[in-house]
Amino acid sequence: MRSWSAPKVPKLPGSGLPLRLYDTATREVRETEPSGKARMYVCGITPYDATHLGHANTYLAFDLVNRAWRDAGHDVHYTQNTTDVDDPLLERAQAIGVDWRELADREIELFRTDMEALRILPPRDYVAVTEVIDDIAEVIVRLMERGATYRIGDDVYFSVAAAPKFGAISGYDEETMRRLFAERGGDPGRAGKRNPLDWLLWRGERPGEPSWESPFGRGRPGWHVECTAIALRHLGPGFDVSGGGSDLIFPHHEMGACEGHVATGEWPFARAYVHAGMVAYEGEKMSKSRGNLVFVSELRHEADPMAIRLALLARHYRSDWEWTPDRLTEAEARLARWRAAVARPAGPDGAALLARVRERIADDLDAPGALALIDAWAAADGDDASAPGLVRDMVDALLGVAL
């Protein structure tokens, strides 16, 4: 599937530092150690509504990872999916009276436009689930061959008993797992399951639902195995970062990691699991089900997309925080100050600022710390004639903000 257009990224002098990120699985900030090529998979949207600021916050976080790796000299292989067949999409399409494919195509195109406006570097592989049904079925066959599955009618389930590493990503206790599984699309109470936490790999054909042929009958894939199959196809096991919002820690990333482990025999499925915090609005997490969304497509018609980007960068990527209009006002003022500063004929030492900003970004993407350093530079005087141009390029290359 077509990705979106890539902005030009300035080449900075010198080289970026090794990137350290908080790994959910080990509960510590540790160095990412890509061997030449850096491989990253970030879970994409289910395209049944427009991109909201919660989405933007997540994809901006991993855009910083992408940029930091590139600055350090790595060739980045970034893969992202879009879940273009799933229950919420089918339900929304039926509710508004359109074909589910039409709805998905429309929202995917809007997502592309939003990502371009925010200057998010595009993935090398932008993959729709409906493009890789055969690959997904192949992974399920491998799980079957390893005795990790069972059937309930025409549906195929993964057995938690076959996953020795289950729980290694989240570290959650069983009570928490059951609660989150029920809240996030699981079916712990379904009759016939061997364990309430067993999860769906393949949903047998239902009347009025899209379906595809497979070695185990017509149907469509479950959510978790979709990302497992796409990551294996494009990146292989042991890729550097698996990313998404913190609401994907469980069940999605936990279950996907187990599928990858059992299917390949290799652990870890990803070398680090990195998660962005949740954005709230009007007192609750921003989500489609709650209807408290701030859409990027609407906001960027009211404000410079670079101000939106700066508003998101002002909070550490792992933080949970609440959006208010004041945050955009503050970001617009910051953007104006920075643009005025790089328009000067000279400024304080640009090379020293670059070194310090690189340190902040390398330390678990401390974007707020980087912003504070640039604020101080913009407020000071200096006689380095090369500084304004260097700072303009630095802000573009590392933070993705065009001045």
Curated annotation (Swiss-Prot):
A motif ('KMSKS' region) lies at residues 285-289. Keywords: ATP-binding, Ligase, Metal-binding, Nucleotide-binding, Zinc. A motif ('ERGGDP' region) lies at residues 183-188. Zn(2+) binds at C43, C227, H252. Binds 1 zinc ion per subunit. A motif ('HIGH' region) lies at residues 45-55. L-cysteinyl-5'-AMP binds at C43, G44, I45, T46, T58, N81, T82, T83, W223, G245, S246, D247, V279. It catalyses: 1D-myo-inositol 2-amino-2-deoxy-alpha-D-glucopyranoside + L-cysteine + ATP = 1D-myo-inositol 2-(L-cysteinylamino)-2-deoxy-alpha-D-glucopyranoside + AMP + diphosphate + H(+). Belongs to the class-I aminoacyl-tRNA synthetase family. MshC subfamily. HAMAP family: MshC (MF_01697). This is L-cysteine:1D-myo-inositol 2-amino-2-deoxy-alpha-D-glucopyranoside ligase. The lineage of its organism: Bacteria, Bacillati, Actinomycetota, Actinomycetes, Streptosporangiales. The gene is mshC.
